[in-house]
């Protein structure tokens, strides 16, 4: 199979490229990435000379480039996105352009070039927030209620993808995932920032009271779920992908990281809260489990310790990103 992977130099995208080439060495992958601050070709050093892999630096908003690449492939796997909520609050424009216009350009390319199979990666943040302490979880039938420019842009892209299926018969699938963690994550997100700050001897910042709850998904479990959706998912369907950490708060996660790194709670610094900060996310991943047989393989503590060790062993990788 020939794949176009967008955003394949980013955190989740690069993990997927590595996963896919290892599992299916006969596949060929074109990786289209603009190489913004979050894209890093060092993530893909191990495959850069693989004859089945090709990197193209470019923008998904460029229709001529997108058309030329989609003509060569059977499947588009669309990761490319601006994803950092704080950055979307400071400047929403790049999120609107990349996440909405870029998705439109890719959909048009897939439609014009033989209705190519299209998988769209999205987020659980499109559903808004759940009440802290409740047992409610997001499911595929949860109404959309985005609260940040980032999540609103992803919600818009999800609706566009579905519209291209309903209007033009484009063979699409969508996955909405929980927050990811693991190797190659840019050190501005909770796990990477906390771990690298400790390694630098700095305080670990925690927003507000630290009681915000997220569902955390190890990136390799996410890659396996996407692979199953590509192989066996029903066209036109959406699948939610969650982890094994439901109802663990941010402050509990930071305390675990500190414990595993032999530090104390004196290394925590509570900082001003983020505007519009959603209190709780939790995912019901029953559908993908029942239909495709997927469930997370990595326990949270096991994967967290592996992530800490990865950052310890790859100091040259993250230090360059923090300077």
Show where each model-derived region lies.
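N-terminal Rossmann-like NAD(P)+-binding domain of SDR-like oxidoreductases, especially those catalyzing
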Residues: 1-180, 220, 306, 311-314, ...
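C-terminal substrate-binding subdomain of Rossmann-fold SDR/epimerase-dehydratase oxidoreductases
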Residues: 16, 58, 198-323
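Generic alpha-helical secondary structure signal
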Residues: 39, 75, 125, 159, ...
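Generic structural signal for short, solvent-exposed loop/turn connectors between secondary structure elements
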Residues: 1, 71-74, 114-115, 182, ...
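Short, solvent-exposed loop/helix junctions and linker helices
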Residues: 6, 89, 97-100, 150, ...
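Residues in well-ordered alpha-helical elements
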Residues: 64-67, 86, 93, 104, ...
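Alpha-helix N-cap/loop-to-helix initiation residues
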Residues: 37, 62, 187, 246-247, ...
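NAD(P)-dependent short-chain dehydrogenase/reductase
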Residues: 43, 130-137, 147, 159-231, ...
